[in-house]
Amino acid sequence: VTKMPDFDFMKSREEVFGLDCKPVTWEKAQLLSFSELKPWGWSPRVHNLLKDLKSRCNEQFRESVMSTWSDERKDLYSRRMAATCLTEMVQAIPCLGKDIIPSECNTLAEIRLLSEKENIVVKAPWSSSGKGVLFIPKGEITCKEEEVLSGILRKQGYVMVEKRLNRVLDFAMEFEMDRLFHLNFLGYSVFQTSRRGEYEGNTVASNSSLEGIIAKYTGTGFLREIREQLEKVVTTVFHGKYVGYLGVDMMIYEDESGEFGIQPCVEINLRYNMGIVSIALQRYLRESVEGVFNIHFSPKPGEIMQSVEKNRDMYPLLMEAGQIVSGYINLTPVSRESRFVAELYIGNK
């Protein structure tokens, strides 16, 4: 860290979550040894940021696929890779339907042609969490949108274009690929997004409860078939190329006839993500208790701090036998200068 977190905040969160975290400043980190480095996610910028610490890691990490960055690795993080996995999923489970597979477009003319047929969603190849996404109604692409798309095509080379689906539920399957490239299923994630696909929050609940929410639309058997096939596809595609956490975003949608369908590979996030955070948080809740994890942002000085203080008063944290029963807790320290806070609401909000 660049600055040590507030001591009282760290101590109070250690009491709630039983964690013994020891943040270190950049200066001290240069003097320490590490078994490995596990940032939120890897990118050229993060590799450069941590370059001086790599030599202080053990040999196993220094020789691993995650220790260096190359242009070949860049495509692993693209929407093209998600489309590749989705295509294999549809081939294995034909009832998913080919019309959910995105098209790769290299020119504005190709995008216009698809726009004339139906409502579309256009996505930049390297973007996530609702960023770099344009929703274009059938035949109504604007000059401003064409300008934005031209910029993306110029900088990134292509875009992915898909049919706009009537979204009913956003969810994900969370995994970890170990050093031997075995894929381990961690659990489900049910999350909320804005109309434009930007992340808003996660439901924090037991895995069986989350599976039940999703299975209302898919049936438990079909949902597990999706998971089994996804594990095969992801293992094959990323074997020998990636180690760490990853999440596959999915969607339940309603088609023109009122039937529910599933898009089983909207996006692949090769990093920690909010779903994995939510799975970790659930372990601290009493059995059968559920909550909501979200990120609250405000550009106004003092507003975040005021909101946190209000929530603490309105929803006091209640714990029994070391587990959270109800209430509110901010998961990041706040001050008057804070612009965001990660927070957890437990029980009835």
What are these regions (language model features)?
Residues 118, 143-200, 251-265, 273:
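Phosphate-binding site of ATP-dependent enzymes
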Residues 175-232, 269-296:
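ATP-dependent carboxylate/phosphate-activation module, predominantly the ATP-grasp catalytic core
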Residues 126-127, 165-169, 240-244, 334-337:
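A short catalytic or substrate-binding loop motif that flags glycine-/basic-rich loops and adjacent residues
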Residues 3-113, 127-128:
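Conserved N-proximal alpha/beta basic substrate-recognition cap immediately N-terminal to
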Residues 100-104, 119-146, 172, 195-214:
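Glycine-rich phosphate-binding loop of ATP-grasp-fold ATP-dependent ligases
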Residues 286-349:
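Peripheral (often C-terminal) accessory segments that flank ATP-dependent C-N-forming ligase machineries
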Residues 105, 114-137, 151-167, 248, ...:
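ATP-grasp fold ATP-binding core
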Residues 154-156, 163, 185, 198-260, ...:
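A long amphipathic alpha-helix within ATP-dependent nucleotide-binding catalytic cores
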